[in-house]
């Protein structure tokens, strides 16, 4: 059953349904509404109105995203990249990452312990494997090097 988004009311209702599930950024919401067949002019009008009413907020979306992604083991570089791909401004992303109150070193250690059971690499191959995984997850090489050398562990 396909919903036809040919009226402003239908576009608004669909946008509100999406926002009821979780926060969305404007670019992401626009993309989803276009995929459902809504006209660009109606999308802009509906989203402008939702923004005026406080139902669509980039700041809330940033805060929500930055609070839940680290719990999945992702670091600041990966989160920054994902938010950039979703059309958010780099300055806003950097501000949200600074103000989130997350200890990225602790997050790195938690992610490493979950994946590698807290075992430091015994050879270059294992060190490279652990480093690649943590780098892909969005942690800086400086932080990873300190961790894998055993300098930051508080066991």
Curated annotation (Swiss-Prot):
Q: Name one GO cellular component term.
A: cytoplasm
User: Mind giving the lineage of the organism this protein is from?
Assistant: Bacteria, Pseudomonadati, Pseudomonadota, Gammaproteobacteria, Pseudomonadales
- A biological-process GO annotation: regulation of DNA repair
Q: Which Pfam families match?
A: RecX_HTH1 (PF21982), RecX_HTH2 (PF02631), RecX_HTH3 (PF21981)
Organism listed in the record: Pseudomonas tolaasii
Q: What is this protein called?
A: Regulatory protein RecX
Coarse class of the primary localization is cytoplasm
PANTHER family, per the entry: REGULATORY PROTEIN RECX FAMILY PROTEIN (PTHR33602:SF1)
Q: Which family does it belong to?
A: Belongs to the RecX family.
Has keyword Amino-acid biosynthesis?
A: no
The answer to whether UniProt assigns keyword GTP-binding to this entry is no
């Amino acid at each position: 059953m396909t919903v036809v988004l040919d009226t402003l009311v239908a576009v608004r209702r669909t946008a509100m349904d999406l926002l009821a599930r979780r926060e969305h950024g404007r670019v992401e919401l626009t993309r989803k509404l276009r995929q459902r067949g809504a006209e660009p002019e109606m999308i802009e009008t509906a989203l402008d109105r939702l923004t005026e009413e406080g139902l669509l907020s980039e700041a809330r979306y940033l805060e929500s995203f930055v609070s839940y992604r680290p719990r999945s083991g992702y670091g600041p570089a990966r989160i920054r990249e994902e938010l950039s791909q979703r059309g958010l401004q780099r300055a806003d992303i950097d501000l949200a990452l600074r103000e989130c109150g997350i200890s990225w070193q602790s997050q790195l250690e938690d992610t490493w312990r979950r994946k590698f059971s807290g075992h430091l690499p015994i050879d270059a191959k294992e060190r490279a494997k652990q480093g690649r995984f943590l780098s892909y997850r969005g942690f800086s090489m400086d932080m990873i090097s300190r961790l894998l050398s055993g300098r930051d562990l508080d066991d």
